[in-house]
Amino acid sequence: MTKQQMIAMFIAMIITSALVSAATIMGGIWYLNKQAQDSGETSSLLENSPLSFLVTEQPTSKGPSFHPLDKVVLSIKGKKQTHFVMLELAIETRRPERIKDIDNYMPMVQNSLLKLFSDKTFDELQQTGAIDILQNEVKQTLLVAFAKTDIVRDIDDVLLTKYVVQ
């Protein structure tokens, strides 16, 4: 046998061994669950083991859920006077249980929005299409603000639910 044939045979043996091992484990799990169901036990052997993820179903929310955030009032520059912007935001998620603590981050949200609006002018916010642009900017700002937290992966969208400029 040549060196290439030996390597090919060795790789084939490793793959075969891995497949047989995986099939044995899956067959054992199936057998144990089948035995538990046939014997009338209410819980299977795996439910209390480290392999419980194999038999438990993860609940998923079918539709989106919206979590409202506190109202944010900011000042913006005008030509002759200072104006105020009032925003109410909602976070869209499909995992509401994972963002239940988002209200604890409101100071971070307010700080991020304050930085975003510090460069805005009254005229910019009154232009046609400003709300769509602003919504995208607010979303990106909040995603950056939450980037160092676990919450960021559960935010599907950020919506402006109220927008008042005076």
UniProtKB/Swiss-Prot annotation:
* Pfam family name, one: FliL
Q: Where are the transmembrane segments?
A: 6-26
The UniProt record lists the keyword Cell membrane: yes
Membrane-topology annotation of the record: Single-pass membrane protein
Any one of the GO BP annotations = bacterial-type flagellum-dependent swarming motility
Q: Which keywords, in A-to-Z order, does the entry hold? A: Cell inner membrane, Cell membrane, Chemotaxis, Flagellar rotation, Membrane, Transmembrane, Transmembrane helix
Q: Which compartments is it annotated to reside in?
A: Cell inner membrane
What induces the gene encoding this protein?
A: Under conditions in which the polar flagellum is not functional.
Q: Name the GO cellular-component terms.
A: bacterial-type flagellum basal body; plasma membrane
Keyword Lyase attached: no
Q: What does this protein do?
A: Controls the rotational direction of flagella during chemotaxis.
The family note in this entry says: Belongs to the FliL family.
Q: What is this protein called?
A: Flagellar protein LafL
* Organism of this sequence: Vibrio parahaemolyticus serotype O3:K6 (strain RIMD 2210633)
Task: Identify the coding gene.
Answer: lafL
